[in-house]
Amino acid sequence: MNVRPLESADRATYDELALRHGTLFNRWDWLDLFGDRMQALGLFDEGGTLVGGLSIFQDRRLGLRIWRRAPFTPSCGPFFAPKAQNPVAILEERRAALDAMADHVEREAPAICMLPLDRRIQDVLPFFWRGFKVVPNYTYLLDLAPAPEELLKNMSPERRKNIGKAGRDGLVVRAETDLRVVRELVLGTFRRQEKFVDETCLDAVLFRYARPSNSFAFVTCRDEMPIAACFVVHDGQTAYYLLGGYHAAERHHGAGAAAMFAAIRHARDAGLKTFDFEGSVIPAIERYFRGFGGQATPYFTINKAWLPIEIALKFSKRNFF
């Protein structure tokens, strides 16, 4: 297999493959949100047939080319249409796809490469063997098959307490269609935490991508004032928690959890199978997501940099390089 940029004539085939074998984050309607900085790449078999793909968000800092995931995008792929049937042949086919991806990174040689893989990819030896730093990350996946009462029962005592307190204190959770409300709460939270957020990309997700068929939001209110928000995107199988925020002056320990539980119930009622919390390795955030009862699920990021840069990064980003 080999990886190369897509031609315009490949777009329809790529999107069909992404629909069948990828996630919503591989589809054109998502990739197009990020303009020229997002590059979609095709994965071609030995006969030149397009069988899959991946995406790379290209950035520049201090004149250096950096490849990474796009904002609000959990993974870059790759995805492909499998042909093999034998277990050994399936393994070899998957590794061929990863080898092709590694070939492309090494051939293009960006100064820094930090690409998160699809969580379904658990065999990352092709990258390890070729000198990439393979870093495990974790998300939490919640099976939506149980009834809401069972889902609540499976949460941690702390999370159940949070949700119960929200109800006892008179907080009300509502579906929110005015995504300006979500934006305000999300931006306020990022600013308080002194974290950078790309507002252009945030607005693209909320106001260009989001529609009733692919997303929903819930807010928790006190006396009609929104004090916490939860925004979710989804395909036909999986709901992805993408954005959340809270009002600092009106914060309540149960407000965020109540909005999240409403989103979980809504995803279940919509017939979705899994709720993906898009987890974090930051201890406090990881503990919060864990409390909702999901299954810890690893996914991997592959990192590589020019040697002088990699040596420098070992001092500031030891966990990644």
What is the role of each PLM region?
Residues 2-47, 53-63, 118-137, 146-147, ...:
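A conserved beta-strand-loop-helix scaffold within acyl/acetyltransferase catalytic domains
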Residues 38, 107-110, 215, 272:
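Short, high-confidence coil segments that cap the C-terminus of an alpha-helix
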Residues 58-77:
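Conserved acyl-donor/pantetheine-binding loop and adjacent beta-alpha core of acyl/acetyltransferases
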Residues 73-89, 145-146, 244-253:
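A short, internal acetyl-CoA/4′-phosphopantetheine-binding micro-motif in the GNAT/acyltransferase core
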Residues 88-102, 252-265:
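Conserved acetyl-CoA-binding loop-helix of GNAT-fold acetyltransferases
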